[in-house]
Amino acid sequence: MTVATPNLTTVPVPPSDSRERVKQFMQTLQDEICAGLEALDGGGQFREDSWERPEGGGGRSRVIREGNVFEQGGVNFSEVWGEKLPPSILAQYPEAAGHGYFATGTSMVLHPRNPYIPTVHLNYRYFEAGPVWWFGGGADLTPYYPFAEDAKHFHSSFKAACDRHYPQFYDVFKLWCDEYFFLKHRGETRGIGGIFFDYQDGRGDLYNKGPAPSGPAGQKAAEVGIVSDLNWEKLFAFAQDCGRTFLPAYSPIVERRKDTPWGDRERQFQLYRRGRYVEFNLVYDRGTIFGLQTNGRTESILMSLPPLVRWEYMYQPEAGSREQELYDVFLKPQDWVNWPTA
């Protein structure tokens, strides 16, 4: 099924105060998440570095290290603007050429010390350039040891957020997340996914400008068809709801796992699997690529990387082990919302 994209003249116009409103929300989201994580950790506190970008803009980078729960994590807010659009944007939106741009967002990655607590990532962003604007973002979970109830809770939380705004959001954005967080050179997903969306501007279908229209996410979006009743306000409300879904989606998982005993075997496997996180972020991640292309703050861009990591040549998990279960079940796309749990 081929879905025609409406003419550019049909793009809904954002409000005149769009940039300020989104910026304020992204800052508030950073504040709320940091406060919630400090309470969850019970010991660690975030250190803040404010920075300015010579070409225009700046941000606040907050890092927590050596806490009771979090070995290292970062929550970053940024807003940047400029006249020269990066190649990654022009490739998608040639009509933005000749216009200045504005981008703002909040991103987060947490690397817990206990291998039974999953790593988690979040990012919500907004972009404007002349007649072009869009929202993007999502959240995904990367466990080291498999717990179906954790995967089900995380996915169910974000499905509920999606369903509050548009009933087909989760169906498309879950598949898009599975597609995006996939390491092609390894043939495996980065974790159990979550939701991911990009280029949402109220026109076209929900997989607007996605790279694989014939894949599962593109096909599901084609089944849904063009969504004609989404505008700037509705998409902004959706992004806000998703941002505030993170803490109730993740905190119960941490509470369940933080006191689970672990030893050197679990630690070594955690460090090995963290290598996949490094590989993805340096090879595939759009946010990393965009930040480096726009002369962003390198320390903030690379704050997603874990403090310790290791690689092992030709590693194979032991047959019948929980590590093997991770590979067999949890590093492949699954219907986690409907997964049976005890």
UniProtKB/Swiss-Prot annotation:
<comment type="function">
    <text>Involved in the heme and chlorophyll biosynthesis. Catalyzes the aerobic oxidative decarboxylation of propionate groups of rings A and B of coproporphyrinogen-III to yield the vinyl groups in protoporphyrinogen-IX.</text>
</comment>
<feature type="binding site">
    <location>
        <position position="121"/>
    </location>
    <ligand>
        <name>a divalent metal cation</name>
    </ligand>
</feature>
<dbReference type="GO" id="GO:0006782">
    <property type="term" value="P:protoporphyrinogen IX biosynthetic process"/>
</dbReference>
<feature type="binding site">
    <location>
        <position position="111"/>
    </location>
    <ligand>
        <name>a divalent metal cation</name>
    </ligand>
</feature>
<protein>
    <recommendedName>
        <fullName>Oxygen-dependent coproporphyrinogen-III oxidase</fullName>
        <ecNumber>1.3.3.3</ecNumber>
    </recommendedName>
</protein>
<dbReference type="GO" id="GO:0015995">
    <property type="term" value="P:chlorophyll biosynthetic process"/>
</dbReference>
<feature type="region of interest" description="Important for dimerization">
    <location>
        <begin position="277"/>
        <end position="312"/>
    </location>
</feature>
<feature type="site" description="Important for dimerization">
    <location>
        <position position="185"/>
    </location>
</feature>
<feature type="active site" description="Proton donor">
    <location>
        <position position="121"/>
    </location>
</feature>
<dbReference type="GO" id="GO:0005737">
    <property type="term" value="C:cytoplasm"/>
</dbReference>
<feature type="binding site">
    <location>
        <position position="155"/>
    </location>
    <ligand>
        <name>a divalent metal cation</name>
    </ligand>
</feature>
<comment type="subunit">
    <text>Homodimer.</text>
</comment>
<dbReference type="InterPro" id="IPR036406">
    <property type="entry name" value="Coprogen_oxidase_aer_sf"/>
</dbReference>
<feature type="binding site">
    <location>
        <position position="107"/>
    </location>
    <ligand>
        <name>substrate</name>
    </ligand>
</feature>
<comment type="pathway">
    <text>Porphyrin-containing compound metabolism; protoporphyrin-IX biosynthesis; protoporphyrinogen-IX from coproporphyrinogen-III (O2 route): step 1/1.</text>
</comment>
<comment type="similarity">
    <text>Belongs to the aerobic coproporphyrinogen-III oxidase family.</text>
</comment>
<dbReference type="Pfam" id="PF01218">
    <property type="entry name" value="Coprogen_oxidas"/>
</dbReference>
<dbReference type="InterPro" id="IPR001260">
    <property type="entry name" value="Coprogen_oxidase_aer"/>
</dbReference>
<dbReference type="GO" id="GO:0004109">
    <property type="term" value="F:coproporphyrinogen oxidase activity"/>
</dbReference>
<keyword id="KW-0350">Heme biosynthesis</keyword>
<dbReference type="InterPro" id="IPR018375">
    <property type="entry name" value="Coprogen_oxidase_CS"/>
</dbReference>
<keyword id="KW-0149">Chlorophyll biosynthesis</keyword>
<dbReference type="GO" id="GO:0046872">
    <property type="term" value="F:metal ion binding"/>
</dbReference>
<feature type="binding site">
    <location>
        <begin position="123"/>
        <end position="125"/>
    </location>
    <ligand>
        <name>substrate</name>
    </ligand>
</feature>
<dbReference type="GO" id="GO:0042803">
    <property type="term" value="F:protein homodimerization activity"/>
</dbReference>
<keyword id="KW-0560">Oxidoreductase</keyword>
<feature type="binding site">
    <location>
        <position position="185"/>
    </location>
    <ligand>
        <name>a divalent metal cation</name>
    </ligand>
</feature>
<keyword id="KW-0479">Metal-binding</keyword>
<keyword id="KW-0627">Porphyrin biosynthesis</keyword>
<keyword id="KW-0963">Cytoplasm</keyword>
